[in-house]
C-alpha cells in the first residue's frame, strides 16, 4: 500500500506543479488504533515550484484534497503550515510527529521553532470531548468503541501535558506516559483490542465505567483549564523562514 500511496502523491506533484516536502499518516493508523477496514488518512506539505505562484494579487488555493479508494489525502501549502504552526495548531503538530512517514523532509522546515503551546493543546483535547458530550446531551451520542477511544486518547494527552510531557502519537506509548489505575488501564487495552479486531467483548457495565470516567475527567479538565496561561509566538521568524523557502535560500 505504501508504494501506491507514494505513486499517488507523485501524480499529484505532477498535476499541480508542486513539490511535496513531507507526507505522513494521520489519525487512527498513526495512533495505532486502526482495524482491517480503516482508511489511509494521508497528510502532506508542499510548496509551489514557481516563485510566481507566491507573488500574485490573489492567493492560490493552499489546500489540496484527493480521495482515491482507501486513501483520504489532504495537503497544505508550506505557507499555510508555517502560519498554523505559529498559531500553535495541534493538527500540524501531530502531522510532524507521526511515525508513519511516506515522504521524509530533506531538511527540517520547522527547525528552531518552539513546540506547540501546552495550554493550547490542553484546550484542544478538552474541546473534542466537549463536542462529543454535547451530542450525547442532544441524544445524538456516538456509542462506538472508536468514539470512546478518541475521547480516552484526548484525556491521556491532557494528563501527559499536565505532567510536563509531550504526548506520544502512538496510543500504547501514550498510555505508558500516564499513571492509570490497573482496572482502568486494562479496560482501555480491552477496548483497543476489541476495536482493532472489530469484535466487541467488553461488557456494558465496563463501558458504563469508562463513560463515567470520561465525563468525570472532562469536568476536571475544564476546571483546571481555567488557570491556563497562553504563549503568543513571534511570527517574524516564520516570515523569514517562508521568505527563505520561496527564494531558495533555505
What are these regions (language model features)?
Residues 1, 49-51, 77, 101-105, ...:
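General structural signal for secondary-structure boundaries
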Residues 1-20, 24-37, 43-95:
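Metal-dependent nucleotidyltransferase catalytic core
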Residues 63-68, 97-99, 132-139:
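Short acidic (Asp/Glu) patches
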Residues 92, 103, 158:
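Glycine-rich, aromatic-lined ligand/substrate-binding cores of catalytic
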Residues 95-111:
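Short, glycine/charge-rich beta-strand/loop segments that flank catalytic centers
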Residues 107-236:
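Conserved nucleotidyltransferase catalytic core and NTase-mimicking acidic/glycine-rich helix/loop elements
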Residues 231-250:
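Acidic, carboxylate-rich catalytic segments that either coordinate divalent cations
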Amino acid at each position: 500500500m505504501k508504494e501506491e500511496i507514494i505513486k499517488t502523491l507523485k501524480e499529484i506533484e505532477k498535476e499541480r506543479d508542486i513539490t511535496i516536502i513531507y507526507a505522513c499518516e494521520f489519525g487512527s493508523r498513526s495512533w495505532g488504533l486502526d482495524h482491517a477496514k480503516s482508511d489511509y488518512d494521508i497528510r502532506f506539505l508542499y510548496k509551489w515550484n514557481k516563485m510566481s505562484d507566491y507573488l500574485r494579487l490573489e492567493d492560490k488555493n493552499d489546500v489540496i484534497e484527493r480521495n482515491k479508494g482507501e486513501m483520504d489525502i489532504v495537503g497544505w501549502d508550506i505557507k499555510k503550515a508555517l502560519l498554523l504552526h505559529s498559531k500553535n495548531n495541534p493538527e500540524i503538530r501531530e502531522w510532524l510527529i507521526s511515525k508513519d512517514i511516506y515522504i521524509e523532509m530533506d531538511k527540517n522546515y520547522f527547525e528552531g521553532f518552539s513546540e506547540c503551546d501546552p495550554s493550547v493543546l490542553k484546550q484542544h483535547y478538552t474541546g473534542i470531548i466537549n463536542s462529543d458530550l454535547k451530542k450525547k446531551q442532544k441524544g445524538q451520542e456516538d456509542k462506538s468503541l472508536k468514539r470512546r477511544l478518541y475521547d480516552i486518547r484526548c484525556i491521556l494527552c491532557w494528563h501527559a501535558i499536565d505532567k510536563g510531557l509531550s504526548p506520544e502519537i502512538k496510543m500504547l506509548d501514550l498510555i505508558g506516559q500516564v499513571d492509570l489505575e490497573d482496572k482502568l488501564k486494562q479496560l482501555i487495552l480491552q477496548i483497543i483490542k476489541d476495536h482493532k479486531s472489530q469484535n466487541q467483548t467488553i461488557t456494558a457495565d465496563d463501558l458504563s465505567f469508562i463513560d463515567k470516567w470520561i465525563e468525570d475527567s472532562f469536568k476536571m479538565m475544564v476546571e483546571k483549564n481555567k488557570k491556563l496561561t497562553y504563549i503568543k509566538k513571534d511570527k517574524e521568524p516564520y516570515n523569514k523562514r517562508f521568505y527563505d523557502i520561496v527564494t531558495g535560500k533555505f
